[in-house]
Amino acid sequence: MHTLSVLLALAPVSALAQAPIWGQCGGNGWTGATTCASGLKCEKINDWYYQCVPGSGGSEPQPSSTQGGGTPQPTGGNSGGTGLDAKFKAKGKQYFGTEIDHYHLNNNPLINIVKAQFGQVTCENSMKWDAIEPSRNSFTFSNADKVVDFATQNGKLIRGHTLLWHSQLPQWVQNINDRSTLTAVIENHVKTMVTRYKGKILQWDVVNNEIFAEDGNLRDSVFSRVLGEDFVGIAFRAARAADPAAKLYINDYNLDKSDYAKVTRGMVAHVNKWIAAGIPIDGIGSQGHLAAPSGWNPASGVPAALRALAASDAKEIAITELDIAGASANDYLTVMNACLAVPKCVGITVWGVSDKDSWRPGDNPLLYDSNYQPKAAFNALANAL
């Protein structure tokens, strides 16, 4: 596989083979293959990234390399290279990503790893409501812009995180008790966020940690108290109107056991109901904050849990915030192989690069140690791919 990648990198554009499934096939500045293999179609994800997806063969005309006026373009769909992301794409997936934020951008050891190993980034905090709109109609984008600019300049896909969440929510939103006011506030916040980054975001976590309590019922929050279930449709429809090309997700934690109420009577049942009602939900994000093998939600439960989520009517699923207490090589392999085995699973994002920067520092849950050296789990994934 490495030899093939080198040969493709050295070949002239005219000699490039057709792009494989999930491979890049166009976008502003793209100079690689612009047709897809048989049985695939070239679909626009955003202005800079077109991707080969299952469907009728052939391709539509793509932007030439002169379009875009020098605008940075993500090349995360390129299957060349030897990092985790490139190897994962070679197995038919869209990305292997990580979480960063603006305060990581001057950390050279961390950023060098991101550039070499990961093809997608999620912003840890700077896109959350308290950071973006601390007071009504007063938006602050500077820190989120830094992450988006880094990603586009370095060819990384972006997951927008997050539009609605009951935590990190300004007090002025929590104090709203009027249905029409809260509806207008949600619509304005979502429209403003999604419009600003239109064409740059692959996936949005439209609703995050917000939907379900552990028994599968709606979580108590200002959104559910004032609007009931309706806040879901309000948020998703506003996001779809603002950027029809972005994939829209419900993202939640503790979706790691196939028979757990939060998975069955919570996520799967409600997503099916909402999709049937016309709410534009594209995907389910399972965060994957996992325990060690003896804990409540070990990695061993993930394969069956992913299959249960994939049995829903959502078009795709993703593992969005993966970290595992102890970072056992076997546990990471279990999760990666579970995603590889489920066609709807489009990608994995680990929740940070190094244990030094993890929100769970005592658990040492990531692929790199506190000195930014690869751990056994990283080596196991790289070797398995």
Swiss-Prot record:
GO molecular function: cellulase activity; cellulose binding; endo-1,4-beta-xylanase activity
Biased composition (Gly residues): 67-83
Positions of region (Linker): 53-84
Enzyme class: hydrolase
Location of the active site: 210, 321
EC number: 3.2.1.4
Residue ranges of domain CBM1 in the record: 23-53
Keywords carried by this UniProt record: Carbohydrate metabolism, Cellulose degradation, Glycosidase, Hydrolase, Polysaccharide degradation, Signal
Signal peptide coordinates: 1-19
Record's GO cellular component terms: extracellular region
Region named Disordered: 56-84
Parts of the chain that traverse the membrane: none
Catalyses which reaction(s): Endohydrolysis of (1->4)-beta-D-glucosidic linkages in cellulose, lichenin and cereal beta-D-glucans
Domain of life: Eukaryota
GO BP: any one term: cellulose catabolic process
Residue ranges constituting the GH10 domain according to the UniProt record: 105-384
Family statement drawn from the similarity comment of this UniProt entry: Belongs to the glycosyl hydrolase 10 (cellulase F) family.
Protein name: Putative endoglucanase type F
Protein's organism: Fusarium oxysporum (Fusarium vascular wilt)
Lineage: Eukaryota, Fungi, Dikarya, Ascomycota, Pezizomycotina
